[in-house]
């Protein structure tokens, strides 16, 4: 689409990623990340599904995704999306939480949308400072303030113990897919692994994980491809190593989940490596 902007900035002080999408119409299918996402809508309206909950999100709404939260979103009434977010890896979150609370426990955010929240302004200022590479001290203050408010008021440690554990069979399937994501896995392979019929496996996995086995494996592939691209591996080689049939196949799924093409993503990390 013309006049759309897709950018990713790496912050060398906070060790987090800052994404910005402007004027996009893209639908993001059900997927998950291995990191925390804290974002907000600047313009547009979206339908969001996250962990079996549905929302209509608008400008000013703050979004919170935990690692492995399955979520999807799409535009409403043909409106384009302006969106900013920061991605925080679990180890960075753990260090920040320890500074704030003295505890090394990772937070779990049970509220995925904070409607018209005042913290959105703090996140917006933080994102702009990261993008402009300015005011390191102010930036670090904002980051810790933002996390402190979210952890103290919106994280729920007790919630972790009440989250239903997937069945042993579903755990086996997840582990198998995470080990064999680069292979041509079939539903029959998973059926034999669990002793379940194909239909029962597909239905049970989707119900318990909120995502189909194939979408789960595609997400694992994309996450692995990101790691390879960050190391400077060429997209064509990353596609081969992660089980995609070719580079165009990987590009299609990569852009659907990440919002950038593999080449765009790789170039950002190339720039950081040469600083």
From Swiss-Prot:
SMART domains xrefs: HTH_ARAC
Gene Ontology BP annotations: regulation of DNA-templated transcription
DNA-binding region(s), residue ranges: 188-209, 235-258
One annotated GO molecular function: cis-regulatory region sequence-specific DNA binding
Pfam families, per the entry: AraC_binding, HTH_18
Coiled coil: none
Gene3D superfamilies for the chain: Homeodomain-like, Jelly Rolls
InterPro entries on file: AraC-bd (IPR003313), AraC_XylS_family_regulators (IPR050204), Homeodomain-like_sf (IPR009057), HTH-like (IPR037923), HTH_AraC (IPR018060), RmlC-like_jellyroll (IPR014710)
Domain HTH araC/xylS-type: 171-268
PROSITE patterns in UniProt: HTH_ARAC_FAMILY_2
Keywords in alphabetical order: DNA-binding, Repeat, Transcription, Transcription regulation
Protein name: Uncharacterized HTH-type transcriptional regulator YbfI
Organism: Bacillus subtilis (strain 168)
């Amino acid at each position: 689409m013309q006049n759309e902007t897709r950018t990713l900035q790496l912050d060398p002080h906070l060790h987090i990623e800052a994404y910005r999408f402007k004027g996009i119409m893209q639908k993001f299918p059900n997927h998950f990340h291995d990191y925390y996402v804290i974002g907000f809508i600047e313009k547009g309206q979206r339908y969001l599904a996250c962990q079996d909950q549905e929302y209509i999100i608008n400008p000013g709404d703050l979004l919170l995704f935990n690692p492995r939260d399955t979520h999807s979103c799409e535009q409403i009434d043909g409106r384009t999306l302006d969106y900013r977010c920061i991605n925080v890896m679990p180890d960075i979150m753990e260090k920040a939480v320890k500074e704030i609370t003295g505890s090394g426990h990772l937070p779990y955010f049970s509220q995925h949308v904070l409607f018209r929240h005042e913290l959105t302004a703090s996140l917006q200022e933080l994102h702009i400072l990261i993008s402009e590479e300015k005011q390191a001290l102010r930036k670090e203050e904002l980051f810790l303030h933002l996390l402190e408010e979210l952890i103290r008021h919106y994280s729920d440690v007790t919630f972790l113990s009440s989250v239903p554990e997937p069945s042993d069979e579903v755990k086996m399937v997840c582990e198998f897919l995470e080990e064999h994501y680069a292979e041509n896995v079939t539903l029959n392979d998973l059926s034999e692994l669990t002793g379940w019929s194909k239909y029962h496996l597909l239905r049970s996995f989707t119900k318990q994980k909120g995502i189909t086995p194939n979408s789960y494996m595609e997400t694992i592939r994309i996450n692995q491809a990101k790691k390879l691209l960050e190391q400077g591996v060429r997209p064509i080689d990353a596609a081969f190593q992660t089980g995609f049939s070719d580079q165009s196949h990987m590009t299609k799924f990569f852009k659907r989940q990440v919002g950038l093409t593999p080449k765009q993503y790789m170039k950002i990390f190339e720039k950081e490596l040469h600083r």
